[in-house]
A protein has these predicted regions:
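Phosphate/pyrophosphate-binding catalytic cores of soluble transferases and nucleic-acid-acting enzymes
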Residues: 1-274
Length: 274
């Protein structure tokens, strides 16, 4: 059974902009951690780790193989690897949230880069939520945020990871095509509908790539063409950073995306670890 590890596909109604697999294409296979939260609800990596590990444990207990599909490299690592989360401090968090609102995500990311360049290099400058969390951890622990990131050690050893390798020009083109398809398929209407469900109040969902750009368009801050262009740019940058995460993991078996024997090779990798 499938276990989603995409940070934004957990939200109900965020379908087009997250490229969520439609129910008709799931072929009757159970998919877990899709459409779990309303767009108003915040979600953290620590919460997601608990949810996903509980699902994996339940599947294991009944002899079903969990297939994690993502998505978000940090979320996947949090589920697979030994990863203990630092505590939280609501007062410290609130102060950094207020600073984020006052100076914006780019300036806050610059400050993080001064304190912990490694952590800053792993997250997008516009991801204010993660920057706030990193600064909170640094202040609470007195240590770099990067020191709290997961080690390359499986929490559940019988695990195999497979990645699809693709050249950057092809990936960039596919991202541009996918963004165009999302807008053509009704991303703007989806965001308008989600506004009625509280997207603007959602601390996590409102910051998703594509949704924040469309929000800027609907508020008159961007033209539609600019919203498309910025979504393409942000997605490409996100993809590069995700690749930066995964390329450093020697446990991942990479298979060319256009390999005619892709499925057979993937099954062989899984079989060799059984």
């Amino acid at each position: 059974e499938i276990v989603n590890t995409d940070a934004m596909q957990v939200y109900r109604g965020m379908d087009i902009g997250t490229a969520k697999l439609p129910p008709a294409q799931r072929r009757g296979i159970p998919h877990h951690l899709l459409d779990t939260l309303s767009v108003r609800e915040p979600a953290t990596v620590a919460q997601f780790q608990g949810w996903a590990r509980a699902v994996v444990s339940q599947l294991r207990e009944r002899g079903t193989v969990p297939v994690l599909v993502g998505g978000s490299a940090l979320y996947t690592r949090a589920v697979l690897d030994r990863f203990e989360f630092p505590g939280t401090d609501e007062v410290v968090r609130a102060r950094w949230e207020a600073e984020l609102a006052a100076v914006g995500p780019a300036e806050l990311h610059r400050r993080l880069a001064e304190r912990d360049p490694e952590a800053a290099g792993r997250m997008l400058p516009e991801n204010g939520r993660r920057t706030v969390r990193a600064l909170e951890v640094i202040e609470i622990t007195g240590e770099p945020y990067s020191a709290s990131l997961p080690a390359l050690e499986y929490a559940d050893p019988p695990t195999v990871q497979i990645g699809l390798d693709i050249d950057r020009p092809t990936l960039d083109l596919r991202i541009e095509q996918r963004v165009e398809e999302m807008f053509d398929e009704g991303l703007v209407a989806e965001v308008e509908r989600l506004f009625d469900e509280g997207l603007a109040e959602g601390r996590t969902a409102s910051r998703a790539i594509g949704y924040r750009e469309v929000t800027a368009y609907l508020s008159g801050d961007l033209s539609l063409a600019e919203a498309r262009e910025r979504t393409v740019f942000a997605t490409r940058r996100f993809a590069r950073r995700q690749y930066g995460w995964t390329s450093k993991d020697p446990r991942i078996v990479w298979i060319p995306y256009d390999d005619p024997q892709l499925l057979d090779r993937a099954l062989a990798v899984v079989g060799s670890c059984a």
